[in-house]
């Protein structure tokens, strides 16, 4: 009986240690993922978190396609095996888990509706210009009065 109890206690101890190590590994993985998200948001002038099948994400990307953005990264969350974790991390910075999420110059702008409203007020281009997110090396074409 004592031998069985000793084996059971050993198995419980091993299981506990394994669970603690797994938790530490998971925490490190989540921290690494958060660091990557923060790095992307801070280093890209325009950062979009989206899902390929989401109609609002498609509409936001269509709005942004009207601008010649030179530094934009789009992360399609549904193509990741960490979709839920990424959405929870994004919630820390945007207050929401839904997509799309647009960040310009490291600041959360909003989703489709907010971006569309900003564009309709004529404020999206100035926001992108202020972020130096638009191509500026275009050669102006002279107007010959034609």
Curated annotation (Swiss-Prot):
What cellular-component terms does GO give this entry?
cytoplasm
Q: Top-down, what is the taxonomic lineage of the species of origin?
A: Eukaryota, Metazoa, Ecdysozoa, Nematoda, Chromadorea
Key words of the record: 2Fe-2S, Iron, Iron-sulfur, Metal-binding
* Transmembrane annotation, as ranges: none
| Domain Glutaredoxin per the UniProt entry, residue ranges | 34-135
Biological processes annotated in GO: cellular response to oxidative stress
Q: What InterPro entries does the database record attribute to this sequence?
A: Glutaredoxin, Glutaredoxin_euk/vir, Glutaredoxin_subgr, Thioredoxin-like_sf
What's a Pfam family this protein contains? Glutaredoxin
State the similarity comment.
Belongs to the glutaredoxin family. Monothiol subfamily.
Q: What are the GO MF terms of this UniProt record?
A: 2 iron, 2 sulfur cluster binding; glutathione disulfide oxidoreductase activity; metal ion binding
Q: What is this protein called?
A: Uncharacterized monothiol glutaredoxin F10D7.3
- Residues annotated for [2Fe-2S] cluster binding in this entry: 54
């Amino acid at each position: 009986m004592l031998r069985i109890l000793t084996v059971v206690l050993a198995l419980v101890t091993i299981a506990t240690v394994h669970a603690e190590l797994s938790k530490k590994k998971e925490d490190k993985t989540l921290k690494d993922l958060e660091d990557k998200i923060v790095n992307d948001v801070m280093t890209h002038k325009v950062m979009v978190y989206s899902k390929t099948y989401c109609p609002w994400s498609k509409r936001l990307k269509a709005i942004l396609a009207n601008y010649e953005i030179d530094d934009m990264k789009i992360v399609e969350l549904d193509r990741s095996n960490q979709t839920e974790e990424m959405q929870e991390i994004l919630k820390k910075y945007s207050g929401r888990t839904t997509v799309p999420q647009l960040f310009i110059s490291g600041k959360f702008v909003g989703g489709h509706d907010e971006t569309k409203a900003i564009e309709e007020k004529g404020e999206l281009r100035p926001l992108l210009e202020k972020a130096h997110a638009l191509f500026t090396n275009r050669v102006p074409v002279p107007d010959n009065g034609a």
